[in-house]
């Protein structure tokens, strides 16, 4: 069954394994999430739990939000997400979900919003090769063919300059190096998408090795 928790990316550091290997890790702070709602097949057409993370001030919440979280006897939340494929019997409305649902060595998928890079060219955005930089080439960092005379148009799917980043990205099969239940921290091997302090979702791996 799927397990999951919402957290905030703190940054990267490194730890040593027992054999002395240096492991780069991303620190994720996952303060206790609260189960706000259980969705059932009878009422909603599918099964899922809705969890909330990070309290926000009462005056910033509207009336429907306040009424929704009142059923779970908790404060309004900044971030609310649904998790599907979970063991519905293991959760109740108002229950706290903590980092100790995971264990050391477990494989997870981490989803976040990538850093926005603004308007970028085809080389940086799509990883294309540049043209020769020598004198007289007249083709250095351009996107490439825009369609010859016969089609008289640019083909669909042509990789062009545009806004880069700011998209939802999921990195799969990352190993949890350490679970610090006292400080609500997860240390995940490698890097995860997003800037510091950005929201990330940690879930059981879909394609675990």
Swiss-Prot record:
Segments for region (Disordered): 118-152
One Pfam family from the record: Ribosomal_L3
InterPro entries: Ribosomal_uL3, Ribosomal_uL3_bac/org-type, Ribosomal_uL3_CS, Transl_B-barrel_sf
Signal sequence bounds: none
GO molecular function: rRNA binding; structural constituent of ribosome
One term under GO cellular component: cytosolic large ribosomal subunit
A single BP term in Gene Ontology: translation
Quaternary structure and partners: Part of the 50S ribosomal subunit. Forms a cluster with proteins L14 and L19.
Name listed for the protein in its UniProt record: Large ribosomal subunit protein uL3
Species this chain originates from: Bacillus licheniformis (strain ATCC 14580 / DSM 13 / JCM 2505 / CCUG 7422 / NBRC 12200 / NCIMB 9375 / NCTC 10341 / NRRL NRS-1264 / Gibson 46)
Gene from which this protein is expressed: rplC
């Amino acid at each position: 069954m799927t397990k999951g928790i919402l957290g905030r990316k703190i940054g990267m550091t490194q730890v040593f394994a027992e054999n002395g290997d240096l492991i780069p890790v991303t620190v994720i702070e996952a303060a206790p999430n609260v189960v706000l709602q259980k969705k059932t097949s009878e009422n909603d057409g599918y099964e899922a739990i809705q969890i909330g993370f990070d309290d926000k001030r009462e005056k910033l919440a509207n009336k429907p939000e306040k009424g929704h979280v009142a059923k779970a006897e908790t404060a309004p939340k900044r971030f609310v997400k649904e998790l599907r494929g979970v063991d519905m019997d293991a959760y109740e409305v108002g229950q706290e979900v903590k980092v100790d649902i995971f264990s050391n060595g477990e494989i997870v998928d981490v989803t976040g919003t990538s850093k926005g890079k603004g308007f970028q060219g085809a080389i940086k955005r799509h990883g294309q090769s540049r043209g020769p930089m020598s004198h007289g080439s007249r083709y250095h960092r351009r996107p490439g063919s825009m369609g010859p005379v016969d089609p008289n148009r640019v083909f669909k799917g042509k990789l062009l300059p545009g806004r880069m980043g700011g998209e939802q990205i999921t990195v799969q099969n990352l190993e949890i190096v350490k679970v610090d239940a006292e400080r609500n921290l997860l240390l995940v091997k490698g890097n995860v998408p997003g800037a510091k302090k950005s929201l990330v979702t940690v879930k059981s791996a879909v394609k675990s090795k």
